[in-house]
Amino acid sequence: LDMLKSDGYKAIFIATGVWNPKTLNVKGETLGNVHYAIDYLKAPKSYNLGERVVVIGAGNVAMDAARTAKRNGADTYVLYRKSFEDMPATKVEIEEAKEDGVKFELYKAPLEIYEDGVKYIQTERVISEDGRVSFKTLEGSEGVFKCDSIIVAISQAPRTNIVSSSRDLSTDKYGLVVTDEKGITTLNGVFASGDVVSGPKTVVEAVANSKKVAHAIDEFCKNN
């Protein structure tokens, strides 16, 4: 960004998306039967997943990975620690996954990955007196879900070469760029929009937000 500014650009727009998969941080995640959805979806035919596949996560990318694995012949399950209502995936994506034959294992949180499955602990929904919903693990409810391969799909984060290496460009705890409603970042003349700001969303949302930011960039260039 500093080099672009020194080259005379008035405004810079960051829309690099999120391409680094987030990890589960559980024992066994480096085993050879563990893959990341963002990588798998680039070339699914090149993966030999076996007969039974578990996708960990419940966003749109998780649904895409599960449906793709199912269409390629695997008996596919989505493992999620909450309920259908709590899934970040759109209702359309969830319903289409069901129609494709994807099965769902809910209220199960992964603890460890083995060569032949995922160790999990069951969870339950808890509603506090003020109506807030949370989930707690149930002691003694551990089990192992047998599978040949695991696909991790618990969201993505921005690549660090642009975002975290830029001085004065604020990011949140997830590594996403902080902006106002016009896409203005904490670095003068730098704007951002799309998944690099919001995290993984739909293309429609990214395009709609970027149109708003384009107007802000135009206004900035006219006044500077």
Model-derived regions, located:
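FAD-site-proximal beta/loop scaffold in flavoenzymes
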Residues: T30-G50, E129-P200
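Cofactor-binding loop segments of dinucleotide-utilizing enzymes, especially the Rossmann-like FAD-
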Residues: A58, R81-S83, D195
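Rossmann-like NAD(P)H-binding beta-loop-alpha module
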Residues: N48-A74
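A conserved FAD-binding loop/helix module that cradles the flavin
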Residues: S193-N223
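General small-molecule cofactor/ligand-binding pocket signal
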Residues: H35, K103-E105, K119, F191
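Rossmann-like dinucleotide-binding cores of NAD(P)H-dependent redox enzymes
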Residues: A66-E112
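Feature captures the FAD/FMN-dependent oxidoreductase FAD-binding
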Residues: L1-K27, L111-K119, V126, S149-I151, ...
